[in-house]
Every structure is written in C-alpha cells, then in structure tokens.
C-alpha cells in the first residue's frame, strides 16, 4: 500500500512536466543554433533512442563523435547516417564490462582530447544478472562504467579544463535517497530493478557534484534528465507505464535536446538537475536530502573499478 501511494504521488506530481506537454511548454519550437565544428565528442549508449539522437545532433552540427555501443552493426549503420560536416566513429565496447570500458577510454585518449563526454548509457534490469566480472549488470552499466570511462579519459589527458561532461540521469531519481548498499544487490532475492535504477540515477547527481568540486583546470559537469521518452528501453522495461502514457511520451529528439543545449551554452554549474533547458531542484521530496553523498560514493566506486579492471 505504501508503495502504491508513493507511486501515485510521484506520477501526479510529474506527469505533466515530464511529458511531451512539459517539453512544449518550456522549449516549444525553439531551435538550437549551435556549431560544434572541430569538437571531439564521446557518447555512450549511442545506438538507440536518446543516445542516437545526441550523436546525430552533434555530428550534424560539425562534431566528430565517437559512438560507444555493443552492437557493431548498429554502430556502422549509425555512422552512415552522419549529415553535415561532422563524422561518427564507431567504438564497439560492452559498457557493462569494466576492462572493455577501460580499454576503450585508453584508446580514445591516445587519439586526442575530448571536448564533450556524454554518459548516456543506461539499462533497467528487472532480472538479477551478473557480468563476468562479478558485478550486477545494471550497476556496472549505469554507474561504475561511467566512473571507469571518466577516470580513464582523465588519466589519458583527454579531458581538460574546457571539456564538458553531461550525465543522463532519470526523473526516477526523485524518488530515491542515495543508499550505497542499494546500488548493487548481492543476489536475486534482494534485487529490485526499479529501485536499483533510481539509485544509480541519484548517484549520477552526486558524481556530478564531485566532478565540479575538483577545482580550476578540470572539466565542468552537468546532470540532466530527458523526461519521459518513448525508447526501446521503456518499451521493454516498463510496458505498463508505456501503455498508459504513450500518447504523451516524448520523442528521442526531445530527450536529447537539453544535452545538446548544455554542450552549446555551458551554463553555470551548481546544484540542480537540468530538464528542458532549465535547472530544477534535484530534490522534490524532503527525504532524499538525507541520502549518502559523493564523499562515500567515490571511494567505493574507485575500489570496485580497480578490482574489476585489475581482475582481482
């Protein structure tokens, strides 16, 4: 009963702003007059939905985009769709495997600097699955892989003071106070895919605070969420939700808009999460303020990343 009441409150509060109606109210027909010529981008989760729209949007405005994804055929097809002066370079990588992510980061860094890094990949896993490295699949894909990619690019000198980091969170994080123990269940009996996903997305907010606390000469970071978008992930993970809200779900282009806008405008960093080119509070309910902070999250990610990449 408590869960049902919580869900009702959540949907009542966010149904309009997260829908296509909310996008039209805030962004409307405003275009994006941006020139990314000469910029090098890295986008994870590049072959579907929002990631694909970000890649195509950046390339059409002149960027060279390294598109990270697991499906080689989809990556190659995406590369052929580049328009304008930009290019799309496929980077085949399983973003749930930390050693593969570390390898990709090293290879990207060896090729030069990165102007925009978009942590877009995300998956909601209702069934408990572990990767060959012993990590829960959702945690590895949604959070630890972001950390490994970021750290690998930093160590390789690819990220610099002029770089932008944009993390694609989810409105689901509004219902979660960060709990480090809930980021990764140890077994199927204690796994809840919806709860874990919300935790991963809340953790992205804290990681953004951490990256912005590193001081001058470091990349600046923003965290955003796309609203409710009709993606393959929503179709497979939330079929009931999609059935109810399909008439007002956003397009992938709607979901990608704020990421492209942030990369173009580079607004001031600070607390908050971006939606539809506006900074909103990162807390809609008081209880989420009591969650864990980056001071606990970062050391945990660092240890787990080292174990996974070293094979220990």
Named regions from a protein language model:
Residues 1-40, 292-312:
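Non-catalytic terminal and boundary segments that flank Rossmann-like NAD(P)-dependent oxidoreductase
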Residues 82-99:
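Rossmann-fold cofactor-recognition segment
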Residues 122-130, 136, 162-218, 225-242:
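Catalytic loop of short-chain dehydrogenase/reductase
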Residues 17, 101, 243-285, 292-295, ...:
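C-terminal helical subdomain
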Residues 40, 47-48:
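Conserved glycine-rich cofactor-binding loop
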Residues 61-77:
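Conserved glycine-rich Rossmann-like NAD(P)H-binding loop of the short-chain dehydrogenase/reductase
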